[in-house]
UniProtKB/Swiss-Prot annotation:
Superkingdom field: Bacteria
Similarity annotation: Belongs to the RRF family.
Name by which UniProt lists this protein: Ribosome-recycling factor
Leader sequence segment: none
Keywords per UniProt: Cytoplasm, Protein biosynthesis
Lineage: Bacteria, Pseudomonadati, Pseudomonadota, Alphaproteobacteria, Hyphomicrobiales
InterPro entries: Ribosome_recyc_fac, Ribosome_recyc_fac_dom, RRF_sf
Role, per record: Responsible for the release of ribosomes from messenger RNA at the termination of protein biosynthesis. May increase the efficiency of translation by recycling ribosomes from one round of translation to another.
One term under GO cellular component: cytosol
Alphabetical list of SUPFAM superfamilies matching this protein: Ribosome recycling factor, RRF (SSF55194)
Molecular function as annotated in GO: ribosomal large subunit binding
Length: 187
């Protein structure tokens, strides 16, 4: 956003970005079900550098509680196995040739409650990001009105549009959180 003009679509895009970031973070939270996104944060020591797991292997979900990691290069199997074990996801791979199988253990009730708290923290951070975007948008509108570049009626209309976008995005964030919470607590 620029100080000399206001674009509601830019505000909506930035708010949507906060929602998308939350969706990505929630996808990484482990539930009792297998999900390929669980392994997204795993970094493998490959070819003298750290690489995301998805650049050296294919991750699939053959069963609801099983992940399968097909390593492309036979020489990388041990490095991938070590990266998964070191990732603090609580997963121990069973290696069969170039395929690693990861059984997803049941989560106990305490761990589920912990994960719900983490999900709430992620959601609150996303809400704060949305509020910052709203504040930035409202500040620009106020400056434009003070500089007499827009009328007071336009200011009120734009303020209302920004608030509507904020409410819609916060509602979307709340829905993402509710869905993830339900998924985590489902035994």
């Amino acid at each position: 956003m620029q100080s000399e003009k206001f674009d509601i679509n830019e505000v909506k895009r930035r708010m949507h970005g906060a929602s998308q970031a939350l969706q990505h973070e929630l996808g990484g939270l482990r539930t009792g079900r297998a999900s390929a996104s669980m392994l997204e944060p795993v970094q493998v020591d490959a070819y003298g550098t750290h690489m995301p797991l998805n650049q050296v292997a294919t991750v699939s979900v053959p069963e609801p509680r099983l992940l399968s990691v097909q390593v492309w290069d036979k020489s990388m199997v041990k490095a991938v196995e070590k990266a998964i074990v070191d990732s603090n996801l609580g997963l121990s791979p069973a290696t069969e040739g170039q395929v690693l199988r990861l059984r997803i253990p049941e989560l106990n009730q305490d761990r589920r409650k912990e994960l719900v708290k983490v999900a709430h923290k992620y959601a609150e951070a996303a809400r704060v990001a949305v509020r910052h975007v709203r504040r930035d948008g409202l500040d620009i509108i106020k400056k434009l009105e003070k500089a007499h570049e827009i009328s007071e009626d336009d200011q009120k209309r734009l303020d209302h549009e920004v608030q509507k976008a904020t409410d819609a995005t916060i509602s979307e964030i709340d829905q993402l959180l509710a869905n993830k919470e339900k998924e985590i607590l489902t035994v």
